[in-house]
């Protein structure tokens, strides 16, 4: 009986250690090499296949300096205003999310920073639980410890979902505006950013009033967005 209990404890611990060793190895690799495909991309494409949708993956990596500063500012203004200064976690946002989750009785709000969103996109699935949030936090901490802010942001910009099968700034820019990501205007960047929280909803509801309102909010906030110190755009 004791041996069974020991195995029941050792097995999940071993899986946790193995998975995090795998993740850490990939984080080190991604400091210099672009991901071939993220876990979220794979999950989403499998979902489309199961739903019978004929969707092809459109994912085009471009370096950080070939992405418009307008899009960088728009995303920081909308998704993580403290990105340049925090260590991966916005503690005020996390406390607010915990409060909202407690009031609703389930995990709905995440309080996720850009770094946390990237951790999820690269390695995790879409499930909402405190266990997954804990794993997301562990990955975020590892990533922030060994990766500079520009690279984290570069990975994020290239892995965001924007439409059915459309991932990353370059693919989105060409899909919506037929231009490279480097040439996005403020208005275009704000419109793209407004889609980020619910890209598939807005793909099906492109004339949503909520999308227009969010675009205007992003435009107003862009001027105060603080980019990482090493940004030279």
UniProtKB/Swiss-Prot annotation:
N-terminal signal peptide: none
Topology in membrane: Single-pass membrane protein
Main localization of the protein described in the UniProt heading: membrane
EC number: 2.4.99.28
SUPFAM superfamilies: Lysozyme-like (SSF53955)
Annotated catalysed reactions: [GlcNAc-(1->4)-Mur2Ac(oyl-L-Ala-gamma-D-Glu-L-Lys-D-Ala-D-Ala)](n)-di-trans,octa-cis-undecaprenyl diphosphate + beta-D-GlcNAc-(1->4)-Mur2Ac(oyl-L-Ala-gamma-D-Glu-L-Lys-D-Ala-D-Ala)-di-trans,octa-cis-undecaprenyl diphosphate = [GlcNAc-(1->4)-Mur2Ac(oyl-L-Ala-gamma-D-Glu-L-Lys-D-Ala-D-Ala)](n+1)-di-trans,octa-cis-undecaprenyl diphosphate + di-trans,octa-cis-undecaprenyl diphosphate + H(+)
GO CC terms, sorted: peptidoglycan-based cell wall; plasma membrane
GO MF, one annotated term: peptidoglycan glycosyltransferase activity
Compartments, record wording: Cell inner membrane
Protein name (record): Biosynthetic peptidoglycan transglycosylase
Source organism of the structure: Neisseria meningitidis serogroup C (strain 053442)
Species classification: Bacteria, Pseudomonadati, Pseudomonadota, Betaproteobacteria, Neisseriales
């Amino acid at each position: 009986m004791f041996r069974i209990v020991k195995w029941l404890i050792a097995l999940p611990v071993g899986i946790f250690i193995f998975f995090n060793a795998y993740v850490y190895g990939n984080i080190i690799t991604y400091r210099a090499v672009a991901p071939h495909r993220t876990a979220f991309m794979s999950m989403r494409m499998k979902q489309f296949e199961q739903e019978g949708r004929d969707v092809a993956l459109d994912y085009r990596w471009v370096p950080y300096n070939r992405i418009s500063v307008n899009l960088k500012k728009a995303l920081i203004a909308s998704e993580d205003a403290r990105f340049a200064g925090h260590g991966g976690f916005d503690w005020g946002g996390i406390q607010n999310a915990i409060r909202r989750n407690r009031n609703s009785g389930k995990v709905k709000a995440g309080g996720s920073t850009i770094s946390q969103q990237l951790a999820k996109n690269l390695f995790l699935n879409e499930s909402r639980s405190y266990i997954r949030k804990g794993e997301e936090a562990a990955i975020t901490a590892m990533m922030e410890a060994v990766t500079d802010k520009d690279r984290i942001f570069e990975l994020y910009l290239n892995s965001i979902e924007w439409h059915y099968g459309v991932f990353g700034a370059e693919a989105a820019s060409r899909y919506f505006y037929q231009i490279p990501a480097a040439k996005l205007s403020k208005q275009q960047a704000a419109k793209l950013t407004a889609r980020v929280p619910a890209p598939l909803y807005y793909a099906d509801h492109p004339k949503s009033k909520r999308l227009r309102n969010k675009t205007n909010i992003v435009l107003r906030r862009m001027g105060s967005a603080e980019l990482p110190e090493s940004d030279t755009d």
